[in-house]
Amino acid sequence: AAAAYIAETGRGWLESLTIVKEVFTEADQILPKSIPGSLFKGSLEVLKYLSQAGIKLGILSADNITAVQNFIKYYQLNDYIQIAMGVNDSPSKPDPKLFLQACQKLGVKPVRALMVGDSPTDIEMGRKAGAAGCIGIYWGKAEANYLQGADVAIANLEEIKVF
């Protein structure tokens, strides 16, 4: 989300992502993380719903695996998330290897998987990996132009339904 804000100032997405990574890396060295990032409103309920529907779920993050595992533990998502991967598991987004490795570990072909993400690099990763589709999530912001490569853009996870 921080990279999206920087990109809105006119910088390119990859430049914005690089700036954010550098800033957060420096901040992580100075300040200890006591609480992981926030869980968006309604996310827990949607994860429960999708898990109960038999959907295999994973978190693929540009953060390191320790931070991802701390996030899952803090928000008690272990019952819903089958795989968690961070950048120290694989090259970072938008490289498709992260998505492909997750699909392999889940026993799911990429053409049978969806990528749900809130950044252009999420969407690009899904496209490059051959995902069945890419859902961009803009978390209710006024504009979702930065997700233009997605098959569909949604305001929140609650818009995802299983039929």
What are these regions (language model features)?
Residues 160-163:
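Short amphipathic alpha-helix with an adjacent loop that forms part of the alpha/beta core around
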